[in-house]
Regions:
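Conserved nucleotide-sugar phosphate-binding/catalytic loop shared by glycosyltransferases and other
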Residues: 4-12, 29-81, 227-229, 318
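Donor-nucleotide binding loops and adjacent catalytic segments primarily
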Residues: 48, 52, 173-267, 300-304, ...
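Glycosyltransferases and closely related glycan-assembly transferases
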Residues: 85-99, 106-121, 134-138
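Acidic donor-binding loop of glycosyltransferase active sites
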Residues: 95-97, 259-277, 284
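A short, well-ordered alpha-helix in the C-terminal region of glycosyltransferases
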Residues: 338-352
């Protein structure tokens, strides 16, 4: 047996790839493994890695989806160049194994790992497998899936879930006390870092409908809008007759998500992979409005994992309205036992200590080579 000492992680472009990779990196580091990172110049991952001590390696990979004819014409050169860069980097640092998180940086890096006969691990964050991971799965040593059944059944596929920050995971140790309480319902609205315009516009309308029906049944609200939509959302609440105080907080970002989840009874938002994983692990009921413009409807399939267990309600964006959302909120507010049942069902679904499990599997398999 040979102890694993160095791992190259490939993750770039979006928080959905980078944040889970960071969680796994910390677990590998805690086991004495040196972590290197393959990313792109000027990508969000480069800034996030500042101060971590992980050595950052850059390749000229770029995404191709929806980038126009010029990008597609240049794709063969770009892919060949980034593959060669990846090979040179791996020859230099000689990692024991490579972990790809999907996305455009994992493509050339994964092929380079194959060329150099490095063990290749993949993690797929969504219920629908992305293009890069779908191709690389054929040559991978292990494939980690965040949603059961994302990949075809195989001895190399392991259902592990999505890594969630430790402070958020700890929230799930206590479920909200809903059934016996008479306090106002607490809504956590997650508009996302980029802002979910449809959700941000509809929430003030829904609260206005609830107030018309029963002024005493208006929930307390913490609403994260995303930076670009803060002013418009604040104006929408003001136009609907709400004061931005006394139980209504509207902010561009939420710094302490663990505290926000602990406070909430019901979460309303998109159904990105990380959000769905967090909702499950903290054990909260949710109303999910999947982002409708992904070609493969990733977020809809993510949300169905919760809804199939009666842990969430899905409202597809074309059906989203103030009346519909108010109706769903009012029904759950009136039946706190159902709200608690949804929270309990979500909590029962969630894998825990996912980053730890992935690190353990990687070191066990690599050590056994």
């Amino acid at each position: 047996m040979m102890a694993i000492s160095r791992v190259l992680i490939m993750a770039a472009g979006t928080g959905g790839h980078v944040f889970p990779a960071l969680a796994i990196a910390r677990q590998l580091e805690a086991r004495g493994v040196k972590v290197d990172w393959l990313g792109t110049p000027g990508g969000m991952e480069e800034k996030l890695l500042e101060g971590t001590g992980y050595e950052f390696h850059r390749i000229a990979a770029k995404g191709l989806k929806g980038k126009g004819i010029a990008r597609l014409i240049g794709a063969p050169w770009m892919l060949t160049h980034s593959l060669w860069q990846s090979v040179l980097i791996m020859r230099e640092i000689d990692p024991d194994c490579v972990l790809g998180m999907g996305g455009y940086v994992s493509g050339p890096g994964g092929v380079a790992a194959r060329v150099l006969r490095k063990k290749l691990y993949l993690h797929e964050q969504n219920a629908v497998v992305g293009f890069t991971n779908r191709l690389l799965a054929r040559i991978a040593t292990r494939v980690f899936e965040a949603f059961p059944g994302a990949f075809a059944e195989s001895d190399k596929v392991v259902f592990v879930g999505n890594p969630v920050r430790a402070d958020i995971e700890q929230v799930g140790q206590t479920l909200p006390e809903l059934a016996s309480t008479t306090r106002p319902l607490r809504l956590l609205i997650l508009g996302g870092s980029q802002g979910a315009k449809a959700i941000n516009e509809t929430l003030p309308q829904a609260l206005a409908r609830l107030r018309e029906t029963d002024p005493h049944a208006v929930p307390e609200v913490r609403h994260q809008t995303g930076a670009s939509q803060l002013e418009a959302t604040q104006a929408a609440y003001t136009d609907a007759g709400f004061s931005l105080a006394n139980g209504l907080t509207v902010t561009p970002f939420i710094d302490d998500m663990a505290a926000a989840y602990a406070w909430a009874d019901l979460v309303i938002g998109r159904s990105g992979a990380s959000t769905v994983a967090e909702i499950a692990v903290v054990g909260r009921a949710s109303i999910l409005v999947p982002y409708p413009h992904h070609k493969d409807q990733q977020q809809l399939h993510n949300a169905r994992w919760l809804s199939a267990a009666s842990a969430a309600t899905i409202i597809e964006q074309p059906a989203l309205s103030g009346d519909r959302l108010a109706s769903e909120i009012a029904a759950l507010n009136a039946d706190r036992h159902s709200l608690l049942a949804m929270a309990t069902a979500a909590h029962a679904l969630a894998p825990r200590r996912v980053d730890t499990r992935i690190a353990e599997i990687m070191t066990e398999v690599a050590d056994a080579r």
